[in-house]
């Protein structure tokens, strides 16, 4: 799947859904209502990210056309007093930041933000440190309450990290190696390379995936750096940006 939009053909999605729920439980991720800055599964049933949010019983704040409805967002947060996980693609959150004068969002104490999809798009890109600082300021949220979900269409499982400069963790059936490009050897501790991922939940498809993402080896884990800039940008943020751009 070398195009900007990948494909992953499942016999059925039951194992994918079990992997999502088991990983969430194993990593003790927040047991809170999930509010999603995406379309609903009924509007977009081809997105692995939206299917993940559906599996986690998410509620959605972007309408069927893909437009961010600031009035709907403001209304939800005005009437919500309970902690939540506010989830979406990085580029959808960037759109909120850009339009911060149009929104009045106060996340209740105990809330989290979950972002995913990468920070580089067709029209915009951002440094992760800057992005997290802006998220923290917009929502009055400590940076260590921001979760990054790292996965891709080609995988059935997910990695998660908390805040900045922390390694990504997952369940025991998902492993990653940081590989030196062109040498086919594993990087030394602290060394950069390309991520190779092995997902045993990929029953019926490829267990081993060579990504185009750069990471630093940290023991048996890794710290994600970002996509190799010489390669075509990919990720859920691109799909979100494409939808949002139609209404700008």
Residue ranges, per PLM feature:
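Short phosphate-engaging motifs
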Residues: 16, 45, 92-95
């Amino acid at each position: 799947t070398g195009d900007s939009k990948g494909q992953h053909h499942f016999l059925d999605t039951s194992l994918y859904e079990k992997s999502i729920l088991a990983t969430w439980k194993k990593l003790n991720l927040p047991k809170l209502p999930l509010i999603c800055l995406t379309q609903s599964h009924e509007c977009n049933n081809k997105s692995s990210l939206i299917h993940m949010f559906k599996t986690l019983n998410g509620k959605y704040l972007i309408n069927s056309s893909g437009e961010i409805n600031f009035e709907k967002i403001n209304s939800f947060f005005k009437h919500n007093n309970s902690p939540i996980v506010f989830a979406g693609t990085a580029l959808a959150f960037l759109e909120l930041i850009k339009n911060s004068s149009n929104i009045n969002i106060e996340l209740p104490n105990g809330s989290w933000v979950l972002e995913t999809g990468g920070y580089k798009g067709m029209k915009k890109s951002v440094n992760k440190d800057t992005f997290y600082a802006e998220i923290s300021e917009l929502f009055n949220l400590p940076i260590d309450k921001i979760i990054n979900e790292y996965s891709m269409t080609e995988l059935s499982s997910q990695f998660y990290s908390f805040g900045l400069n922390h390694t990504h963790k997952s369940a025991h059936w998902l492993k990653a190696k940081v590989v030196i490009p062109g040498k086919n050897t594993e990087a030394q501790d602290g060394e950069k390379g390309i991520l190779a991922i092995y997902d045993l939940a990929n029953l019926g498809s490829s267990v081993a995936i060579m990504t185009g993402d750069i990471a630093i080896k940290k023991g048996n884990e890794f710290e994600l750096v970002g996509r190799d800039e010489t390669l075509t940008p990919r990720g859920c943020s691109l799909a979100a940006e494409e939808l949002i751009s139609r209404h700008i």
